[in-house]
Amino acid sequence: MIRALLVAAVWLVTAPVALLPQGPDPVASRAKGRADAPITIYEMSDFQCPYCRAFTLETMPALEREYVATGKVRVVYINLPLASVHKNATIAAQAALCAAEQQRFWPMHDLLFRHQDEWAKLPAPGDYFARLGDSAGVNGARFTHCLSSGATAAAVQADAERARRAGAVSTPTFYIEGGLLEGAAPAAVFRAVLDSIYRSKTGARPR
């Protein structure tokens, strides 16, 4: 079991939970990093959540450079739209999975967070998402049909159920090798957690 770390975030040891997406949505479409990386982070997130945006823009670049690009960590994105407070979060998650069907999840992910302020309060953001999809490099007709038909709605719901089974009640929450890290913690907090896990699993110095 992972030793709980007293850091500037909530770190809870919990039981292992199956979080891999099942069925036609392959995990590879929304994972980054080597499949055999010793550590997997499941990022349970909401595209309309400002704290999730802060993590994506401020913390994730450092983690990508130091852990993902070096083969130590794999990151898997799990949708947890908080629809009661973020009215466009669910359709944004559906749009991201429509892009994932064309292997363009991460470009769409980045655009959704970068332009969050522009679409968050739109009464019907579908057309805006289609423009983001164009920028992400998707086939526009396929993307629009996917989004308008609700083709990915069940996958988003399944994601949310997985996240709740893992113990996530807010966003962002990160399930890391049996523990939960809650909130948009700074890179230093993630380093403390990841370095400890890496040493315990491999016996090697992380950096």
Segments (PLM) and residue ranges:
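Divalent metal-coordination and catalytic microenvironments
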Residues: 41, 108, 143
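Short clusters of hydrophobic/aromatic residues that line enzyme substrate/ligand-binding pockets
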Residues: 31-32, 119, 181
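Bacterial N-terminal signal peptides
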Residues: 4-18
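A short beta-strand-turn-helix
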Residues: 23-39, 67
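N-proximal helix/coil linker or "cap" segments that precede and/or mark the start of modular domains
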Residues: 19-21, 161
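Structural alpha/beta surface segment adjacent to cysteine/selenocysteine redox centers
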Residues: 37, 45-134, 166-169, 196-200, ...
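C-terminal cap of thioredoxin/glutaredoxin-like
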Residues: 44-46, 57-60, 130-207
